[in-house]
Swiss-Prot record:
Top-level EC class as recorded in UniProt: transferase
Classification via PROSITE patterns: PCMT
Catalytic activity, as annotated: [protein]-L-isoaspartate + S-adenosyl-L-methionine = [protein]-L-isoaspartate alpha-methyl ester + S-adenosyl-L-homocysteine
Name of this chain's protein: Protein-L-isoaspartate O-methyltransferase
Keyword DNA damage: no
Subcellular location: Cytoplasm
Protein family: Belongs to the methyltransferase superfamily. L-isoaspartyl/D-aspartyl protein methyltransferase family.
UniProt keyword list: Cytoplasm, Methyltransferase, S-adenosyl-L-methionine, Transferase
Keyword Signal annotated: no
Gene Ontology terms: biological process: methylation; protein modification process; protein repair
GO cellular component: cytoplasm
EC number, UniProt record: 2.1.1.77
Naturally occurring in which organism (per UniProt): Idiomarina loihiensis (strain ATCC BAA-735 / DSM 15497 / L2-TR)
Length: 213
């Protein structure tokens, strides 16, 4: 017998497939990652709905479709060494950790980072390194990265992140001001040349500078 939880996960995966997610590994990992662990218990009944949900500190856990879309875009380039800007709940981090060799994740809000670390241990994911700091600055000492994924909208593409992108690397980043038009951008680096492709309209919380203890 299929449990209610399993049926909700199955329904979510079917929705993602219908909305254009075709990478079977991405779909598998999302189906196996317990999203309900990454949010307040009071919202856990909504965990497998295709919607963003608040996690406190003015932050959200991204809509599953957006996590799947950004991950699928990254995986098209066979990234192994990935920098994530904005750990948040750690859900995107956990998905990445099951698909790439190493994830380096930067979070500006210390309480969120602490909770995300605990969840990584709970899920036995040990290929994740976390840092409390300003996401605009990246994590220079661990770069360059062949993939960078940014989970909040930057007003413009941070130069520090561009500098930490390896030759041939790809950055997936939402760009635009809060409450205004935002676009999901795929940036590729080829030596000193940069190529940008706009994927579509999105809505993210802003990528704020500085950090919070």
């Amino acid at each position: 017998m299929i449990s209610n939880g399993q049926s909700r996960v199955k329904r979510l995966i079917q929705q993602l497939e219908a909305l254009g997610i075709t990478n079977k590994e991405v779909l598998r990992v999302i189906s196996e990652t317990p999203r309900h662990l990454f949010m307040p218990e009071s919202l856990a009944h909504k965990a497998y709905e295709n919607t963003a949900l608040p996690i406190g500190n003015g932050q959200t856990i991204s809509q599953p479709l957006m996590v799947a879309t950004m991950t699928q875009l990254l995986m098209q380039h066979h990234c192994k060494n990935v920098l994530e800007i904005g750990t948040g709940s750690g859900y995107q981090t956990a998905v990445l950790a099951q698909l790439v060799d190493k994830v380096f994740s930067v979070e500006r809000i210390a309480t969120l980072q602490y909770q995300a670390k605990r969840r990584m241990r709970q899920l036995d994911l040990h290929n994740v390194a976390m840092r409390h700091g300003d996401g605009w600055k990246g994590w220079r000492s661990k770069g360059p990265f062949d993939g960078i994924i940014v989970t909040a909208a930057a007003s413009d593409i941070p130069q520090d992140l561009v500098d930490q992108l390896a030759d041939g690397g790809v950055m997936i980043i939402p760009v635009g001001e809060q409450h205004q038009s935002q676009s999901l951008v795929v940036m590729r680096r080829f030596g000193d040349s940069l190529e940008q492709q706009r994927i579509g309209d999105v809505r993210f919380v802003p990528l704020v500078k500085g950090d919070v203890v």
